[in-house]
From Swiss-Prot:
Its EC number is 4.3.2.10. HAMAP family: HisF. This is Imidazole glycerol phosphate synthase subunit HisF. It is found in: Cytoplasm.
Length: 258
């Protein structure tokens, strides 16, 4: 059995790490490189960096900080933000990233997933899915351009349909960003995770809602996700990664101990 992964998420805007609640009202957390090093030193299995306004601004993630991160950490990291072409991805990977993640650009051009997977291998291609539960329809819908609330829009895709579509096109991993839970710290949406797990054949990462160590345990035990991504509980030092891993190991979760 592969070890479960603990993945701090660093949302980047204007060269700094920020964090919002339900993808809105972002506050500045700190500088990118020191935070990345701190999480690596604490025992994170990998890091994810999202330049949250790159796609809506029509630009690609700033590669200068990607190179600086690669110099100070020795764990895998994934970068997302406005990647629209093989050339965009190649440049980010050449600066030291281990994976690239696409979200809004994949919705705009789903063939991008296949082209990237064919060029770099599926193990390198992550698709992020920003999913929102609509009380009015009782359905989960995929959202686009969520890094800027002025540009966010609901797409035609229901979440489960998009999960299956991106797998068929070559996604090697899926990060499910559950917008209703984001930053609220009341637990992952286990109902949604279980539904996605039933149709997801590639590694599945839960994102949005972690507030306690028990929330991580529930995601691993009840929804069988491969990794759990979180931001605010790590940024605000509510949970220490080393202590979290010790707790999970004590509960029988296969995890890499620092």
């Amino acid at each position: 059995m592969l070890a479960k992964r603990i993945i701090p998420c660093l949302d980047v805007r204007d060269g700094q790490v920020v964090k919002g609640v339900q993808f809105r009202n972002h506050e500045i957390i700190g500088d990118i490189v020191p935070l990345a090093k701190r999480y690596a030193d604490e025992g994170a299995d990998e890091l994810v960096f999202y330049d949250i306004t790159a796609s809506s601004d029509g630009r690609v993630v700033d590669k200068s900080w990607v190179a600086r991160v690669a110099e100070v950490i020795d764990i895998p990291f994934c970068v997302a933000g406005g990647i629209r072409s093989i050339d965009d991805a190649a440049k980010i990977l050449s600066f030291g990233a281990d994976k690239i993640s696409i979200n809004s650009p994949a919705l705009a051009d789903p063939t991008l997933i296949t082209r990237l997977a064919d060029r770099f291998g599926v193990q390198c291609i992550v698709v992020g899915i920003d999913t929102w539960f609509d009380d009015a329809t009782g359905k989960y819908h995929v959202n686009q351009y969520t890094g800027d609330e002025n540009h966010t829009r609901v797409t035609q895709w229901e979440t489960l349909d998009w999960v299956q579509e991106v797998q068929q096109r070559g996604a090697g991993e899926i990060v499910l960003n559950m917008m209703n839970q984001d930053g609220v710290r009341n637990g992952y949406d286990l109902t949604q995770l279980k539904k996605v797990r039933d149709v997801c054949r590639v590694p599945l990462i839960a994102s949005g809602g972690a507030g306690t160590m028990e929330h991580f345990l529930e995601a691993f035990r009840d929804a069988d996700v491969d990794g759990a991504l979180a931001a605010s509980v790590f940024h605000k030092q509510i949970i220490n990664i080393g202590e979290l891993k010790a707790y999970l190991a004590g509960q029988g979760v296969e995890i890499r101990i620092c």
